[in-house]
């Protein structure tokens, strides 16, 4: 389970329905074009303000879960912790198409919640073809991908792909050369059947990735002014200054064996994957079509986090913090602040075998589809955590590690005390789904479907109980350790069988050629996934219910398409863990809560004059916590309590605006911009701290030099906005009354991606 170190259980940072797509385009087209009816349009999937190389995460007002990315009908990774999508997939020259599946289609075909990036591998074609893509930026990024494909005769085709990423990030690290070093290789061999009846493809993939950015860009210090704005701390420039110590080494206690080990953060973050897949499609003359996809993946997934915890304002010189100088001598630390950090070394060995099969039949006015998922996932996972202290340099120099000589004689302490995790075993999902897309009349279309899923989970974790309840974590916690009360930490057996189900229905009525009504409803019933069993407690295993309803109108004319929808979504039994902080003590508090969001979205695409296209979206929403209560008793007897029921969900804005104009200057030159406004967001669960609204801006020029060569220039954050976003470290227990008098105080949190100029080129061979 992705651990929650900040407020709101790592809540989605965007909206309820900023991702409500321009449905009117699908509604005024021929409903027999079913390839588009399952996908959303105008979502700029790869235009990402948070990452230079990953897909944009389109949120729906619920806690952040797995990022759904499919390739050839199968999830790129079964679970994204510890094996992230970016470690095994990039939107590069190896893909023939990238789209976005609707929430209803994602729910029925995968059982997951939210939109899904839908991608397809570039397979071989007749003759010889190739594409070379290259991207760089003014910070020194070098990203390239190459696809070569062609025919081999007698219906056989090949496709070979290579992806390389050398990304130093937006500031120089001393502990690693690159913030992202990723390499992905694919090889596909295709046999096409006679008379265009289909094809069979055998594909292999190897990937290796070091996502250093997951910990290098996680936090930075800033001055919280008190009015929702922040100021930079001294010469520490947000986004272009490193907040990591120069020493890359990390000492930790192995959760499985209890041994003390040393590694580097770069090595701990290594992901690798070796997979083989088989895809088949076959079409009969009677409108019957069969698709099947089978993939086996053997992988090591890993994430490293360097989470800021306490920020200590030192009382003059009466402290025991010391640092080592260049000669190895220990000297008193003379800075004003000390940052305590928790290192989380998440890693797991993974084997997954995924199979999906679909049989569809086209009739004169409808398409019927029957599908099967058989997904098996085995993992041996542990998260080893350790604490250390570092300086907070006001001059923008690199932080150094510190030792509190009054408490210890080494850098690292509290091994596995705060957020260590362990689980081992397998999860299996066997599901049957059916959909029917029916043009009842020229004016009325009805789409409906259902999914029935058997989820089996077997294995073990470290949720150990004593007479008083769960033992929980403690310093030097690991399998085989003995708690202060004498309880031995031994694996707890897990064995669950659940029935999950989803159903969806969508109706579109065309009042006339220009205007109509649309409504859809999706109801999802799930149970916890294996990663929810990672903490030292068992999660709430009651069913998780997600109802989603939308209704609205659309209007189309030759120069404009408009859709306006009201929406409702909720989710019960969100399992989460908060790391609550009191003085210098940090304790984990598990909780289960509900969320509910009401929203209204209007989406417009207009072409008022030749060459000009404008896309605009406005979302107003109210995401609120329901039954959000927890408490924890610290060692000094203080009881930390949180009751956020009725509060606005942290990190989620109530106002979203998107404005995307583009203009075709000539037949070969296109100028475009993209503006996204995110309104005021709360930076902790109690609505005590907040950040003012912010703009994310992009702009660029695309030049089609000739049919083979295209060039592009993109500017990220061209308004050069700097500041903080997300949540504030260690602020979970702060109330509104306590925060009222807090002004011009140093805090740590996440920040905006800095001004970046990117140059790209694509050459068709």
Across the structure, where does each feature detected by a protein language model lie?
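C-terminal beta-signal and adjacent terminal beta-strands/loops
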Residues: 27-29, 677-682, 703-765
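Extracytoplasmic beta-strand/coil segments of soluble accessory domains associated
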Residues: 29-75, 102
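Short acidic/polar hinge/loop motifs at secondary-structure boundaries
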Residues: 57, 74-102
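Repeated loop/turn-to-beta-strand initiation elements of outer-membrane beta-barrel proteins
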Residues: 129, 155-158, 195-200, 287-290, ...
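Transmembrane beta-barrel wall of Gram-negative outer-membrane proteins
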Residues: 129, 136-166, 171-243, 276-279, ...
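Acidic/polar loop-and-plug regions of large Gram-negative outer-membrane beta-barrel proteins
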Residues: 190, 199-277, 302-344, 398-418, ...
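Structural signature of Gram-negative outer-membrane beta-barrels, strongest in the C-terminal barrel
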Residues: 348-352, 362-377, 382-386, 390-408, ...
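Gram-negative outer-membrane beta-barrel transporters
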Residues: 442, 559-561, 565-575, 588-685, ...
